[in-house]
Amino acid sequence: MIGDSVDIEMRVYEGAQATINKIFITGNDRTSDHVIRRELRTIPGQKYNRSELIRTQRELSQLGYFDPESINPVPVPNPQNETVDITWELAEKPSDQVELSGGWGGYFGFVGTVGLSFSNFSVKNIKDFSKWRPLPVGDGQKLSVRVQANGRQFQTYSFT
């Protein structure tokens, strides 16, 4: 068979490297924007870099406030002015903990522990009741309260 091949010539013209223009954050109902923005390696004015996008995705995942599978950076290029806008799509996950334990010892009787830990607490929002869910949240601070006691001699109170 003669003439069974096709020659294709492709020409790619590379433009200038895009600069990051705007950063948008969606899906953060509890966590404040400034907590997320301090983890971003993709900053407006810098050149777009895919490895920094991946690094930011990993660091947002390590905060523990978001579902790692749902952290999705969406770059939107604008070829006219050689910029790119990035939208960070996030989905928050529960990160608070409740600890309850109890037991019975022969001499001491009942032994018990009650604890609460909030990993996205906000001291700044204590006076702003609209930010309470059920406590003030959003600034990435940790609050932990724990009480241990037995029926006779031993009690421990912890607040950090």
Where are these regions (language model features)?
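Periplasmic polypeptide-binding modules associated with outer-membrane biogenesis and secretion
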Residues: M1-G106, I126-F154
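Hydrophobic, lipid-facing positions within transmembrane beta-strands of outer-membrane proteins
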Residues: V84-I86, F110-V114, Q155-F159
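A short, contiguous, amphipathic alpha-helix enriched in charged residues
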Residues: G112-S117, K124
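Residue-level signature of outer-membrane beta-barrel architecture
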Residues: F118-N120, A149
